[in-house]
Curated annotation (Swiss-Prot):
It holds the Pfam family polyprenyl_synt. GO terms for cellular component: cytoplasm. This is Farnesyl pyrophosphate synthase erg20. The lineage of its organism: Eukaryota, Fungi, Dikarya, Ascomycota, Pezizomycotina. GO terms for biological process: alcohol biosynthetic process; farnesyl diphosphate biosynthetic process; geranyl diphosphate biosynthetic process; mycotoxin biosynthetic process; sterol biosynthetic process. PANTHER family: FARNESYL PYROPHOSPHATE SYNTHASE, FARNESYL-PYROPHOSPHATE SYNTHETASE.
C-alpha cells in the first residue's frame, strides 16, 4: 500500500478550492476585474512550493489509519492540507514585503509583480480569510469544526508572535549583536516555524479522524515542536554550509543580519578579538565581510558544533518517538516519517 500521498493527486484538489473561493467572492457581486485579480493571487501564491506542509496532512492520515484513505477521507484531508498552504501563502506574501525580498520560488515576490505593490497587503488578508470560507463550506458539520477554527486562529497568532520577535530582534538596517541570544532564537524558531510547519498538519489530521485526545495532542506537541526547532537550526546551518546548487538558493542570513543559530553559537564561543570582527562584519551587504564571518565560523569549528547538536537532538527525538503511547490511536510512524524526511537533509 502507498504510505505517502501522490503529489499529483494532492495538486488535483487545488483547482476546486480556488473555484470555491472565487464562487464565494462572486456572491458579493465582486466586479469581474477584481475576481480575475483574486484568481491570480491564488494561482501565483498558493500552489508551486514544495507543499511539504500540505502533503503532511493526508500522509499523517494514512499513517494513523494504517490503511489507504477512502476517497472522501483523501479529499477532506487534502483540503485541510491546502488550508495549511493558504496559511503559508498569507505568511510568505506578507513576510516578503517586510523583508524587502526579491524572489520567492524562483519568481519575483508577489508584491514585485507589475501593478501589485502595496495591494499585496490586502491580497495577503484575503488569502488568510479564504481559510475560513473553505472550512465553513466543507467542515461546518464536522464534530471538530470549532477545533479546526481555534487551531488555525491559534497557529496564526503563534506565528505572528514569532515574526514580531524576529523583526525587532534583527532589523536589517541596525546591527546590534547584543540583541541576540539563544533564548530569543529558540522563541523565534518555535513560534515562527515549528507550530505551523510541524504541529498544525498533524493536529489537523488527528482532529479530522477524531483521534485528537488531549494525550495524543500533547504527545504530538512534545515531539513535533523539538523537531521543528531542529529543522530550523538545520536550515540556518545549510544557509552557510550548504551547496547553493543543491539548496536552490544562495544563503543570505549573514548579510541580512539574521538572528540565526550559527551567529548565536559564534557569540557564545568567540574571544574579544573575534567579537570585534563580528560586530563590524555581520549584517553588512558586503560579500568580503560575509566571507570573513564564514571564515570565523570555520575557526570556531561550528560545523562540528552543529554535527554534535544534530546527533544529540535526533537521539532525544528518537527516544520520545520510541516511548509514544499508541493506546489512543496515535502512531509512531507519523513521527518517523517526519524525522526521516529531515534528518541529514542537504536541501
Amino acid at each position: 500500500m502507498a504510505t505517502t500521498t501522490s503529489r499529483a493527486a494532492f495538486e488535483a484538489v487545488f483547482p476546486t478550492l480556488a473555484e470555491d473561493l472565487l464562487a464565494h467572492a462572486k456572491k458579493y457581486n465582486l466586479p469581474e476585474n477584481a475576481v480575475k485579480w483574486f484568481e491570480q493571487v491564488l494561482n501565483v501564491n498558493v500552489p508551486g512550493g514544495k507543499l511539504n506542509r500540505g502533503l503532511s496532512v493526508p500522509d499523517t492520515g494514512i499513517a494513523l489509519l494504517q490503511k489507504p484513505l477512502t476517497d472522501e477521507q483523501f479529499k477532506h484531508l487534502s483540503i485541510l492540507g491546502w488550508l495549511t498552504e493558504l496559511l503559508q501563502a498569507f505568511f510568505l506574501v506578507s513576510d516578503d514585503m517586510m523583508d524587502s525580498s526579491i524572489t520567492r520560488r524562483g519568481q519575483p515576490c508577489w508584491y514585485r509583480h507589475p501593478g501589485v505593490g502595496l495591494i499585496a497587503i490586502n491580497d495577503a488578508f484575503m488569502l488568510e480569510s479564504g481559510i475560513y470560507v473553505i472550512l465553513k463550506k466543507h467542515f461546518r458539520s464536522h464534530p471538530a469544526y470549532v477545533d479546526f477554527l481555534e487551531l488555525f486562529h491559534e497557529t496564526t497568532w503563534q506565528t505572528e508572535l514569532g515574526q514580531l520577535c524576529d523583526l525587532i530582534t534583527a532589523p536589517e538596517d541596525k546591527v546590534d549583536l547584543d540583541n541576540f541570544s539563544m533564548e530569543k532564537y529558540m522563541f523565534i524558531v518555535t513560534y515562527k516555524t515549528a507550530y505551523y510547519s510541524f504541529y498544525l498538519p498533524v493536529a489537523l489530521a488527528l482532529l479530522y479522524l477524531e483521534l485528537a485526545t488531549p494525550e495524543n495532542l500533547q504527545q504530538t506537541h512534545d515531539i513535533l515542536i523539538p523537531l521543528g526547532q531542529y529543522f530550523q537550526v538545520q536550515d540556518d546551518y545549510l544557509d552557510a554550509y550548504g551547496d547553493p546548487a543543491v539548496i536552490g538558493k544562495i544563503g543570505t542570513d549573514i548579510q541580512d543580519n539574521k538572528c540565526s543559530w550559527l551567529i548565536n553559537q559564534a557569540l557564545q564561543r568567540c574571544n574579544t578579538e573575534q567579537r570585534k570582527l563580528l560586530d563590524t562584519a555581520y549584517g553588512r551587504k558586503d560579500s568580503e565581510l560575509e566571507a570573513k564571518v564564514k571564515a570565523l565560523y570555520k575557526e570556531l569549528d561550528l560545523e562540528k558544533v552543529y554535527k554534535e547538536y544534530e546527533e544529540k537532538t535526533v537521539g532525544e527525538i528518537r527516544r520520545k518517538i520510541a516511548a509514544i503511547d499508541e493506546s489512543q490511536g496515535l502512531k509512531k510512524e507519523v513521527f518517523e516519517a517526519f524525522l526521516g524526511k529531515i534528518y541529514k537533509r542537504t536541501k
